[in-house]
Curated annotation (Swiss-Prot):
Protein name from the UniProt record: S-adenosylmethionine synthase
Cofactor(s) needed: Mg(2+); K(+)
EC number: 2.5.1.6
Keyword Ligase: no
Region described as Flexible loop: 100-110
Species for this entry: Acaryochloris marina (strain MBIC 11017)
Family: Belongs to the AdoMet synthase family.
Organism taxonomic ancestry: Bacteria, Bacillati, Cyanobacteriota, Cyanophyceae, Acaryochloridales
UniProt gene name: metK
UniProt keyword list: ATP-binding, Cytoplasm, Magnesium, Metal-binding, Nucleotide-binding, One-carbon metabolism, Potassium, Transferase
Length: 418
């Protein structure tokens, strides 16, 4: 990396078509797990003008009305006007669900360790729901130990959605943000560009000229969104920061009418904004036996505790799994030259102190019980604005309860480096 460089991350609002799908998928998951924590769920959603398709594979004892759940979530997001081409009460909802494949189920229900190696350990009972590789990341750029660009991008979209609901009534649900941060010697030092694209009414009060409409939106967003977002942050926009709003000149047609949406298409928004690697697996609509989701949460948990313990300024963790096998195939820890101890020793301590089998992840985080314990909604709340670094939610994988344990276990190595 050069000494001075720019890094960009994006976020999208809850009304973005892909995020509509993610939230519907996780609303279905919440409803099923609330009634039957053993539910196996892979709920996929497609949205387009006037249409929602719910498909995938589900095995459950729960009894839910899928159509009602879909319409309720769309209403909550804000699509209630059929004149905009997509509305909760007028869209068609098609349901095409199958049961989980028995070939997959047999490997999840009884892991290889139990079937072939005759392990009697309870946590060896559940096999990974698929093969795959997952990454987790943490760094000390923000209090929540997230990269600054994605943290800011999420702040902008969350604030944009909030002012749509409470202050700027001419805004519509679809929207995106993008924040470009200036780095020097690996540390953020400035804000180069802030981009906001937001769906809006064609006119604002008596303002009908398109250019005047955009000027009004830009002024309002600067005052109601950008300034509050940066109010408590040391690094702020300055006279050299570019502020771009709806660069096409207009954003009236949006949401599922403007673009089809699909579950699982915003995996970089869901994670670290491109700052860390990604294994490719999406989260939403998947029950916790799917390691795409649960192991990615575990990777974040490990990485965050390492950084919180002061053992590294940056940490990336990779896990990989084989379908039907409980124990990870591989574990990798990378600290990018910022680690205070040898990575091999760090890996050893992580393996000794973190449970990384699927049943262990489910048990550690309570992943199958959380929807029922939290009033029927948990996963749908992380389906927009990121699964990590959420200071507004109580997420078990964001805990730093292992930091002191790691420091204690590695204290001899830390003393040796002093």
């Amino acid at each position: 990396m050069p000494k001075r460089y720019l890094f960009t991350s994006e976020s999208v609002t809850e009304g973005h078509p892909d995020k509509v799908c993610d939230q519907i998928s996780d609303t279905i998951l919440d409803a099923l797990l609330s009634q039957d924590p053993a539910s196996r769920v892979a709920a996929e959603v497609v949205v387009n003008t006037g249409l929602v398709l719910l498909t995938g594979e589900i095995t459950t004892k729960a009894q839910v009305n899928f159509v009602d759940l879909v319409r309720q979530k769309i209403t909550e997001i804000g699509y209630t006007d059929s004149d905009n081409g997509f509305a909760a009460n007028s869209c068609s909802v098609l349901v095409a669900l199958d049961e989980q494949s028995p070939d997959i189920a047999q490997g999840v229900d009884s892991a290889q360790e139990t079937r072939e190696e005759k392990s009697d350990q309870e946590l060896d009972a559940i096999g990974a729901g698929d093969q795959g590789l997952m990454f987790g990341f943490a760094c000390n750029e923000t209090p929540e130990l997230m990269p600054l660009p994605i943290s800011l991008a999420h702040r902008v979209t969350r604030r944009l959605a909030a002012v749509r609901k409470t202050q700027l009534g001419y805004l519509r649900p679809d929207g995106k943000s993008q924040v470009t941060v200036t780095y020097e010697d690996g540390r953020p030092v400035g804000i180069d560009t802030i981009l906001v694209s937001t769906q809006h009414d064609a006119t604002i009060g008596d303002i009908t000229d398109p250019a005047a409409v955009q000027a009004k939106i830009k002024e309002d967003l600067w005052n109601a969104v950008v300034l509050p977002v940066f109010a408590d942050i040391d690094i702020k926009p300055d006279d050299n920061t570019r502020f771009l709003v709806n660069p096409t000149g207009q954003f009236v047609v949006g949401g599922p009418q403007g673009d089809a949406g699909l579950t699982g298409r915003k995996i970089i928004v869901d994670t670290y904004g491109g700052y860390s690697r990604h294994g490719g697996g999406a989260f939403s609509g998947k029950d916790p036996t799917k390691v795409d989701r649960s192991a990615a949460y575990a990777c974040r948990y490990v990485a965050k505790n390492i950084v919180a313990a002061g053992l590294a300024e940056k940490c990336e963790v990779q896990l990989s799994y084989a379908i039907g096998v409980a124990r990870p195939v591989s574990i990798l820890i990378e600290t990018f030259g910022t680690g205070k101890v040898d990575e091999d020793r760090l890996l050893q301590v992580v393996q000794e102190n973190f449970e990384l089998r699927p049943a262990g992840l489910i048990q550690t985080f309570g992943l199958t019980k959380l929807p029922g314990e939290r009033g029927g909604r948990f996963y749908q709340d992380v389906a927009a604005y990121g699964h990590f670094g959420r200071t507004d939610l109580d997420l078990p994988w964001e805990a730093t309860d292992k930091a002191d344990l790691l420091k204690q276990a590695l204290s001899p190595a830390l003393s040796g480096n002093a």
